[in-house]
Amino acid sequence: MTTTPPVLSGPEIRQQFLNFFADRQHQILPSASLVPEDPTVLLTIAGMLPFKPIFLGQKSAEFPRATTSQKCIRTNDIENVGRTARHHTFFEMLGNFSFGDYFKSQAIAWAWELSTQVFKLPAERLVVSVFEEDDEAFAIWRDEIGIPAHRIQRMGADDNFWVSGPTGPCGPCSEIYYDFHPELGDEKLDLEDDSRFIEFYNLVFMQYNRDNAGNLTPLEKKNIDTGMGLERMAQILQKVPNNYETDLIFPIIQTAANIAGIDYAQANEKTKVSLKVIGDHVRSVVHMIADGISASNLGRGYVLRRLIRRVVRHGRLLGINGEFTTKVAATAVQLAQPVYPNVLERQSLIEQELQREEAAFLKTLERGEKLLADLMADGVTEIAGADAFTLYDTFGFPLELTQEIAEEQGITVDVEGFEKAMQEQQERSKAAHETIDLTVQESLDKLANHIHPTEFLGYTDLQSSAIVKAVLVGGELVDQAVAGQTVQIVLDQTPFYGESGGQIGDKGFLNGDNLLIRIEDVKRESGIFIHFGRVERGTVQIGTTITATIDRACRRRAQANHTATHLLQSALKRVVDEGISQAGSLVDFNRLRFDFNSPRAVTMEELQQIEDLINQWIAEAHQTEVAVMPIADAKAKGAIAMFGEKYGAEVRVIDVPGVSLELCGGTHVANTAEIGLFKIVAETGIAAGVRRIEAVAGPSVLDYLNVREAVVKELGDRLKAKPEEIPDRVHQLQQELKASQKQLEALKQELALQKSEQLLTQAQTVGEFKILVADLGTVDGESLKTAAERLQQKLGESAVVLASIPEEGKVSLVAAFSPQLVKTKQLKAGQFIGAIAKICGGGGGGRPNLAQAGGRDASKLPEALATAKQTLLAELG
């Protein structure tokens, strides 16, 4: 008998999935942040990503079974969003996981039970796939579940074999598909036919380890990793034609349609695509900002900026000309908040980020679209790479936006030319990025397979005995190291704090019989503490018993700075905005740094209030209380957790009663009075929506004030002024400098005009127009523009092109065309000078009658001017 699937809401599907596996001894875990711990990916792209260290054997599982609803973002198919029934950037992956517990038979049985008994999908509408060599899975589906063999499709490794990389854990997978058109029969089951089938449940059986030679050996502990797309199951159960029309997304689409004055049901396909893009992208944007991501031009910040810009762009295509994103986001927040309360908590931050990005991009669109329209006029089939780069460099137009707009007009973009023009900036950008040496990390991963995690004693002990478990030189395991060598040492236990949570690692010494190792840093990875240092005396080898002693003075400074950082976050929330959240931190021996999400700078008055409040808390001598408790209890108490951090079932809570309550694994003072004094030294913006406060505490405050006093004294001596007179004296000098610069600019312009007056006799007459092309030497760009305008006015109906080299290697170009010339000859100064500038390796543009451009190759200037003259003679003759 055929069953009819119930019509379930998205939240009901999510909860029924989690309840099903909770009833089968799975621990329900909250979704991890979209900012992953895994440094190899920008964003959380799969439900299994938070468990990857467990699957790779780098970390032990706290539970044998788990189930989650994981928020994910993927942008690799962004161009398909809205154009297909089920491509998204944001989606939720429902998953059940086994870490060395149940395996293939049980996973398949539960997947089938959930699909047919809970969600009541008719068995005759389900088709499954297995890896072509996985006879075991095929037999389970056929013999234990009872699926006819012809409805079990064997597929190749590309579709049905999961790998974590070239080597490591891997295994076959099996997928369940829903058949929208069973009336077509079973004769030809093509699972790649998206109009008929939708894959909604993927079961990965991690049962092998692949070595360097490609050989597969069975794993001792086999794992299960599954994923069910929430949006896909909602499409099936809600009986709608695509994921976008489910209750998970359609309310957002409807909000956008209402703003645009559009009836979705009557809209054409192009309009629906734009509405779907907005519906999808706004979900991504809301969750990304809520998880602490701010728009920028790098990494995940750029992904966010690109998504926001696509929302704005598609809004424009719908005829929405004003700001609208916050209204659409409000609907997304309401849909998300029952499951993701942090979204509602950060709604004001989300709105501020969207308002700022939308306003900035609308200006970019207005400027860039005008130039782009000119570039696409007159039957152009391709936009030159240099022009695309000008749009990017001058107007902030991303290449993909130029491509998107051009594609709508059937025009291509010279991407190779764009990349060539971009090369220098790319090289500068690469040079600015820190090179990460993974050698030691790779060694640690190897060590983690046969060395127990290091026991940390440093919360209570500043000195302890320990046994050397591993010695590394240059990141390679060695048997021993001798005096003079730089080493990395792993101990069975240690009082040294390993760098984490923003706090720097301890310094100190390892002592033994005729052995002394100076430790300069300690890092913690894969549960192992690695001590970086230099052997000063003797020989160290595996099994050596040593005494580990930390530098107490450095520890005291670090813990004072760390507690001060907690006080700083609390003060920021009280003085500036309760919605402020941490975006990063650094706790050093001599200073501290705190990064936080804020759409605006902190004012001088607010900074003073924050500083005063922290010093008040220090003077009040609050005791610091440390407790370890279940994470649920900590959150119930209101403890602040940092987004992006992954916490275990038990967490360490640092409580300064009535002042601050945070989850933290760092070291802290026992009483705030130990901090001594606190001083803010800087507040800056480090990215869009991210601010940074730098400060000093304790003895470092005195060091800071001594340096400031010396600077003030030197300034007073140089300015011949008392300290209190320095501001007035500096203001006086600034005014004098400003007046001098004004006089200098006037002289430069006068000189340029005098030079230009001498050129009038060089003008060449062509028909009813005059042409003047000349090089004015080293005149600056502004003076060049003034001269070109003046000459054109004096010559009457004319075309004037002037050039100069204001500084070494840099070319300035200006074109001034009379109105009649523009009208009758259809010549536009912007297009003309842009083409000439390309000869000098540059670009530019402007109005039809007046435009400026620049170039990077001054040696090509004579050729550029000759081309300009020849072109004008040909066009006007």
From Swiss-Prot:
Q: Catalyzes what?
A: tRNA(Ala) + L-alanine + ATP = L-alanyl-tRNA(Ala) + AMP + diphosphate
Where are the membrane-spanning stretches? none
Against PROSITE patterns, the record matches this protein to:
AA_TRNA_LIGASE_II_ALA (PS50860)
GO BP annotations listed: alanyl-tRNA aminoacylation
Q: Does the keyword Cytoplasm apply?
A: yes
This entry's Gene Ontology molecular function terms read: alanine-tRNA ligase activity; aminoacyl-tRNA deacylase activity; ATP binding; tRNA binding; zinc ion binding
Question: What cofactors does this protein use?
Answer: Zn(2+)
**Which compartments does it reside in?**
Cytoplasm
In the UniProt record, which is one GO cellular component term? cytosol
SS bond partners: none
Which UniProt keywords are given for this protein, alphabetically ordered? Answer: Aminoacyl-tRNA synthetase, ATP-binding, Cytoplasm, Ligase, Metal-binding, Nucleotide-binding, Protein biosynthesis, RNA-binding, tRNA-binding, Zinc
Q: What is its EC number?
A: 6.1.1.7
Class of this enzyme: ligase
Summarize the protein's role: Catalyzes the attachment of alanine to tRNA(Ala) in a two-step reaction: alanine is first activated by ATP to form Ala-AMP and then transferred to the acceptor end of tRNA(Ala). Also edits incorrectly charged Ser-tRNA(Ala) and Gly-tRNA(Ala) via its editing domain.
Q: What is this protein called?
A: Alanine--tRNA ligase
Species per Swiss-Prot/TrEMBL record: Synechocystis sp. (strain ATCC 27184 / PCC 6803 / Kazusa)
